[in-house]
Amino acid sequence: MLTASLYKQLPVLTTTATSTYSFIRLSSTLATPPHSTTTTSPSSPAFHQPNHPQQFANPNTSVFDVSTRIYTQEGIDNNNDTKFLTKAPYPHPVFPQDECENVTVTHRETKTLGDKISFRSIQFMRQCFDLVTGYAVPKTNNPDEFKGTRWEMTEGKWLTRCIFLESVAGVPGSVAGFLRHLHSLRMLRRDKAWIETLLDEAYNERMHLLTFIKIGKPSWFTRSIIYVGQGVFTNVFFLLYLLNPRYCHRFVGYLEEEAVRTYSHLLDELAVPGKLPAFETMKIPEVAVQYWPELTPKSSFKDLILRIRADEAKHREVNHTFANLEQKTDRNPFALKIEGLNKPQPNHGINVMRPTGWEKQDLQL
């Protein structure tokens, strides 16, 4: 016979066992997809998540790697966004192939204290950026000088550098255009076409960025740097433009000099067969074909970089010229072509271009 104490404990044991069994059955039910009568093995296609690993040309990177994952041609085609496309508010001028190839690396010598501060600031920013991204210009003509070291530039590192550069370069034009817009409203007078060119510049830089992100997927580490960097740089540039817009334009002129130098280095590496194989066979994304009038679906990555470098060279000329002008009274010489002049004047193209900027005495203002 059962004792009274043992008899009282039996329901407790039974209840605990029943609850445990029910919990196990519930867990098993939740772990099994509803209305599923087949067993899924790790080797079956349904087991794997649809992350499309075949769309990337380079393998997975480490968590803190700044390299961008390059899409295969299939990945680029799948990422083309052709829905609800609108015409560009600032149509891109035609840049002939020979004029794009004739763009050179130049430097405007510093003349004033403001010039020196602007130039040194750019050099400091570049050195920090080079250190983080593992970038270095070869000191010799040997393209394999840094092969096997952290300074070797791969397709992923090149694209990271381009993406970060364009995310920064798109800020000054929009900030300067916004502040000049407010100034025009506040002072109840014309801006003399500075705003249009500045916003065109910002739009152009953003199109560079939108093109690059169709070619590769930045790492989360790169995205975090861009997120923080944009917040800091935008606010600092905003305050400095209020204080001294002339030297802010000089700063951007030197920034564009570095952009031209970077893209020229990239073009040099593209000229070496087998150096950047993923870029050699790549067809450009649809957004580039829609924006640059000379590009076609058959254009190469090199054709794209030639146009982007030409854009940066134009921004270099524009900002160095703006820094030479009277900020509140002079007109924008790039906005209007004056007929009947017997001397060259700035225009939207790159056929008549002064890389270090136009001096004020040479302009019809």
UniProtKB/Swiss-Prot annotation:
Q: Where is this region: Disordered?
A: 32-52, 345-365
Q: List the Gene3D superfamilies.
A: Alternative oxidase
Annotated Gene Ontology cellular components are:
mitochondrial inner membrane
Q: Which cofactor does it need?
A: Fe cation
- Which residues of the sequence carry a binding annotation for Fe cation 1? E166, E205, H208, E312
UniProt keyword DNA-binding, yes or no = no
* Enzyme Commission number(s) from the entry: 1.-.-.-
Localization, per the record, is:
Mitochondrion inner membrane
Q: Name one GO biological process term.
A: alternative respiration
Q: Which regions are flagged for Low complexity bias?
A: 32-46
Which top-level group of life is the source organism from? Eukaryota
Q: Which residues bind Fe cation?
A: E166, E205, H208, E257, E312, H315
- Any one Gene Ontology molecular-function term assigned to this protein's record: alternative oxidase activity
**UniProt topology in membrane:** Single-pass membrane protein
Q: What does this protein do?
A: Catalyzes cyanide-resistant oxygen consumption. May increase respiration when the cytochrome respiratory pathway is restricted, or in response to low temperatures.
In which family does this protein belong, per the annotation? Belongs to the alternative oxidase family.
Output this protein's name: Alternative oxidase 2, mitochondrial
Q: What is the lineage of its organism?
A: Eukaryota, Fungi, Dikarya, Ascomycota, Saccharomycotina
